[in-house]
Amino acid sequence: MYKRQCLFNAIGYVFFRSLAKAKELRKVVHDAVLSDPDTFSEAALGKPPKEYAEWVLRPNSWGGQVELFVLSTHLRKQIAAYDVQTGRVDIYGEDRFPRSERGHLIYDGLHYDALVFAYPGLEDVSDTHVTVVDCSLEPISKINGFDRKARALAKKDQERRLFTDVANFSLRCLVCQTGLVGENEAREHAKTTGHTNFGEY
């Protein structure tokens, strides 16, 4: 499985309990980008929409804010993303789908994971591992309870420095051994040299 499938695998697991949805979810993003050039302009995407749409179909292309927005819209559900490094929480679809299900992800700077809440003894739930909360049915205290647990986990991971600061981390090109700082230098090095194998040190 490709490392850069994490966002798609996390969304697939949260909403479908499947790790086999990445290709399908990538196609959803591809189609959305091509169908709405006003929303998904080159300025918003960082590259021309057609190029971005083709790029996102590749299994080694990562997902981020654009994909979370598109998938929230497509699924008509909320997606809460908890950023370990900053403590920020972005809830995609909260304003558009306030009475929908909400799935939870945690992000460490490089990797998205599904958040699964274990609630043994829940009534009328055969599986006690909960991946979504239904914002239309659940009391606000339960919704807030999920949020508190997710924030607490992100805070704990932050205190343990279980995140990668992609703007400032030290990398070495494993092809030519050049030292680099941050994702931007690595991207520029890859563009000018064709080298794409990096290691953090």
Model region roles, listed by residue range:
Residues 1-2, 114-117, 198:
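Generic detector of short, aliphatic-rich beta-strand segments that form the cores of beta-sheets
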Residues 3-4, 10-93:
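Papain-like cysteine protease catalytic cores
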Residues 12, 179-182:
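Secreted/processed peptides and extracellular or luminal domains of membrane proteins
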Residues 66-168, 181:
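Deubiquitinase catalytic domains
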Residues 165-169, 182-201:
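C-terminal recognition-helix end and immediately following basic linker
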Residues 171-176:
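Short cysteine-rich clusters marking metal-coordination/redox-active sites
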